[in-house]
Amino acid sequence: MDNLANQGVIVLAAGGTGGHLFPAEALAHELRARGWDVHLATDARAQRFVGAFAQDHVHVIRSATIAGRNPVALLKTFWSLWQGNLDSRKLFRRLKPKLVVGFGGYPTLPPLYAASNMGIPTLIHEQNAVMGRANKGLAGRVKAIAGGFLPENSGAYAAKTVITGNPVRSPVLVAAATPYTPAGKDDRFRLLVFGGSQGAQFFSQAIPAAVALLPEHERARLLITQQARKEDEASARQAYEKLGVPADVAPFFNDMPARMADAHFVIARSGASTVSEITVIGRPAMLVPFPHALDHDQAANAAALAAAGGAEVVRQADLSPQRLAEMLQSAMNEPERLEQQAKAAKSVGKPDAARLLADLAEAIASGKTVQEFKEGNRP
């Protein structure tokens, strides 16, 4: 523990979903290896995702999501954010962090505003190809911006933006060592259906309906792993049982990276963490962006991977059970195409993103500017 005292404290602030917390966890692992004492500021939703942090290093900060125009609701929201600001100031006075890093989501607003007002260096990481609302609100205040899928050298804050990629957790890096082996035309075909950390109700209905339309000899090849919301779990499992298709259905899989490495084909939403893990592990995918995302960030993430040849992108509105069955059957019978797609996906993966982000974090914590960091990292 002596080296922790030498380096000091860094606080990571992240909204309480896997998309925000998984990259924070990956950065925490890298920073700890460099001798930093890493704490997490988050909201009450985060409990199932924070196993990588010691309990006394997880701090729940009061917050709320800004939504709608109801004046009473807005007043309550801003009151919660103000209380979160007080929570954050109290925490920072005790921990004396050398840096606060935000990973998006409204729960990051109180810690990042408090830190910038207290003169603590700040950095935000934007996982998506389009900046989210919380990060947009912070971009003008922070010392540096790190990007996962943000376009290089674009936007009003290009001068203080560094493209690091999205940090992925250690199990993803382990899974990335498993090469992609296409299924032969008579082999079992392992399908992974993944709706992101919060699940996807659409997949729980559409995938079983599509599988039911496949010819019997194609159904007999399938082995399915599907993440489903708790309220959809039983119905999805029963649908596969009626079809005689082996399926492992659950709301959450702790070993998702290993399951992705084992898959021949992935059908998924296109949140930044999901797309990053697909590219680092290198698996062919059909991406169905969440259609109601306020900033259309999932569509932009999916487009970035599709442009590299690493995925097919289909709008949910266009994905009838019939079309889904046709696309699934095509994937099952074109192993060469899937192998090329897997190679293309892996070619754009950034397995060293955690190292790059940690380098930037240490530079900002030491008082360097982004310009100085960029000059020091030129080949």
From Swiss-Prot:
It is a peripheral membrane protein. One of its GO terms (molecular function) is UDP-N-acetyl-D-glucosamine:N-acetylmuramoyl-L-alanyl-D-glutamyl-meso-2,6-diaminopimelyl-D-alanyl-D-alanine-diphosphoundecaprenol 4-beta-N-acetylglucosaminlytransferase activity. GO terms for cellular component: plasma membrane. It is found in: Cell inner membrane. It catalyses: di-trans,octa-cis-undecaprenyl diphospho-N-acetyl-alpha-D-muramoyl-L-alanyl-D-glutamyl-meso-2,6-diaminopimeloyl-D-alanyl-D-alanine + UDP-N-acetyl-alpha-D-glucosamine = di-trans,octa-cis-undecaprenyl diphospho-[N-acetyl-alpha-D-glucosaminyl-(1->4)]-N-acetyl-alpha-D-muramoyl-L-alanyl-D-glutamyl-meso-2,6-diaminopimeloyl-D-alanyl-D-alanine + UDP + H(+). Cell wall formation. Catalyzes the transfer of a GlcNAc subunit on undecaprenyl-pyrophosphoryl-MurNAc-pentapeptide (lipid intermediate I) to form undecaprenyl-pyrophosphoryl-MurNAc-(pentapeptide)GlcNAc (lipid intermediate II). This is UDP-N-acetylglucosamine--N-acetylmuramyl-(pentapeptide) pyrophosphoryl-undecaprenol N-acetylglucosamine transferase. The gene is murG.
